Amino acid sequence: MDMVSLKFIGVGCMAIGMLGAALGVSNIFSSLLNSIARNPSATEQLQRMALIGAGLAEAMGLFSFVIAMLLIFS
């Protein structure tokens, strides 16, 4: 296998990181909706914590995307 093929295999593996971020964000907001349904008085605090968690999970996906782009164009 040449280096170009290995590079694209590596980029394909980096897609797993973006998949993990998407699953993490969906899990966060699913839990948020369940929590708000159980305790509507805690909505403001739960939303704040969910947005922080979603931002951190999404940052991992963006880091994975940046590394994939670096692999493609290097």
Swiss-Prot record:
Entry keyword Kinase: no
Keyword Phosphoprotein on entry: no
Membrane topology qualifier: Multi-pass membrane protein
Main localization, broad class: membrane
GO cellular component: plasma membrane; proton-transporting ATP synthase complex; proton-transporting two-sector ATPase complex, proton-transporting domain
Its biological purpose: F(1)F(0) ATP synthase produces ATP from ADP in the presence of a proton or sodium gradient. F-type ATPases consist of two structural domains, F(1) containing the extramembraneous catalytic core and F(0) containing the membrane proton channel, linked together by a central stalk and a peripheral stalk. During catalysis, ATP synthesis in the catalytic domain of F(1) is coupled via a rotary mechanism of the central stalk subunits to proton translocation.
Oligomeric form and interacting partners: F-type ATPases have 2 components, F(1) - the catalytic core - and F(0) - the membrane proton channel. F(1) has five subunits: alpha(3), beta(3), gamma(1), delta(1), epsilon(1). F(0) has three main subunits: a(1), b(2) and c(10-14). The alpha and beta chains form an alternating ring which encloses part of the gamma chain. F(1) is attached to F(0) by a central stalk formed by the gamma and epsilon chains, while a peripheral stalk is formed by the delta and b chains.
Transmembrane segments: 8-28, 52-72
Family matches, as PROSITE patterns: ATPASE_C
UniProt cross-references to Gene3D superfamilies, sorted A to Z: F1F0 ATP synthase subunit C (1.20.20.10)
Superkingdom of origin: Bacteria
Protein name per UniProt: ATP synthase subunit c
Annotated site (Reversibly protonated during proton transport): E58
InterPro entries (alphabetical): ATP_synth_F0_csu, ATP_synth_F0_csu_DDCD_BS, ATP_synth_F0_csu_sf, ATPase_proteolipid_c-like_dom, F/V-ATP_Csub_sf
Gene name linked to the record: atpE
Subcellular location: Cell inner membrane
GO molecular function: lipid binding; proton-transporting ATP synthase activity, rotational mechanism
Keyword set, alphabetical order: ATP synthesis, Cell inner membrane, Cell membrane, CF(0), Hydrogen ion transport, Ion transport, Lipid-binding, Membrane, Transmembrane, Transmembrane helix, Transport
Family from the record: Belongs to the ATPase C chain family.
UniProt-listed Pfam families: ATP-synt_C
